[in-house]
């Protein structure tokens, strides 16, 4: 298979690494900046903005790729799948219309409401900021304020957590566009990702991501500082009943999309809040999570190229998808000052990483030296029979890096896990 990977982050390095495990797979990559990890795996790369559909389509035709795997959300929103499909390239990724499950928060909520799909929190959509502000002023209780469009995982403000009522009103003024106001959900977050071929849905191991920048879940929201999976592919605060409910919601969404005339193909990412009433949908993403892709793709023991064929041809089957029964812990290194004022162009050096897997993200290689850029730098994944061992592998590797970077030492630790379990019991 000759396959094009679109995107140049840690998630895309994990996708390329998983594809490279298949003998005879030729990888080509289109990305805005040269990712050193992807560049080593690719036969040829094209440096281009990931929303430049002309350049990407021309590169696909020049190289003769038969398939494409789309990593980030921006090219999906721009319609890269529609463009590549028209050029005869089979894509693991949704069309522009289907990607609205992520790129348009109102579309997602309204679809769930129309098809009476479980797990939809109470919500209101406003296109006039004045009406949204009036609703917030009169509403008794806390709300989540979400811009309708893409925000890179950093655009939500939650009353009672990040902002008060006045702060929420100020944020709506700042957005000055469409917003979704939702009931504030209380519980523990978890991620369920699935391969989807338009009809069939094959779930992956559950993952928990950590959005806050600093230890103890403090500080500003980020794109994700790290994540973990358990050896049984569950999470300690998610029951089998909860998992069944979450998967049922995703199956219903895929069926609703097909019924609407937007069949969904690619990766569907469900971010859920496990509440006292069961799982509620925080949001859907139209692609792998970053960092969650690094956990599940490290565990994938079946052939990703075959899975891509199943997605594109509508022949996806759970019998062809298997994951190793092991724990994983992913820890991101980020520049000092991240996310608000990251130190850029700062050299870093990687020490002894042991058995950890390294995934390069927003990092530049200059004359053999790695330098930080403005976002998350690189990630280490530890894989082991137990969570404690996986955490130690990731932590040792992350601690080996010298330079103006930091990471969250608490991700994957028993202490943090115990807090999650205790929090769930309190509900």
Swiss-Prot record:
Disulfide bonds: none annotated. Its cofactor is Mg(2+); Mn(2+). It catalyses: 5-phospho-beta-D-ribosylamine + glycine + ATP = N(1)-(5-phospho-beta-D-ribosyl)glycinamide + ADP + phosphate + H(+). Keywords: ATP-binding, Ligase, Magnesium, Manganese, Metal-binding, Nucleotide-binding, Purine biosynthesis. GO terms for biological process: 'de novo' IMP biosynthetic process; purine nucleobase biosynthetic process. Mn(2+) 2 binds at residues 283, 285. PANTHER family: PHOSPHORIBOSYLAMINE--GLYCINE LIGASE, PHOSPHORIBOSYLAMINE--GLYCINE LIGASE, CHLOROPLASTIC. Its EC number is 6.3.4.13. The keyword ATP-binding applies. Belongs to the GARS family. The keyword Protease does not apply. It comes from Methanoregula boonei (strain DSM 21154 / JCM 14090 / 6A8). InterPro entries: ATP-grasp, ATP_grasp_subdomain_1, PreATP-grasp_dom_sf, PRibGlycinamid_synth_ATP-grasp, PRibGlycinamide_synth, PRibGlycinamide_synth_C-dom, PRibGlycinamide_synth_C_sf, PRibGlycinamide_synth_CS. Pathway: Purine metabolism; IMP biosynthesis via de novo pathway; N(1)-(5-phospho-D-ribosyl)glycinamide from 5-phospho-alpha-D-ribose 1-diphosphate: step 2/2. This is Phosphoribosylamine--glycine ligase. Transmembrane segments: none annotated. Binds 2 magnesium or manganese ions per subunit. The lineage of its organism: Archaea, Methanobacteriati, Methanobacteriota, Stenosarchaea group, Methanomicrobia. ATP binds at residues 136-191.
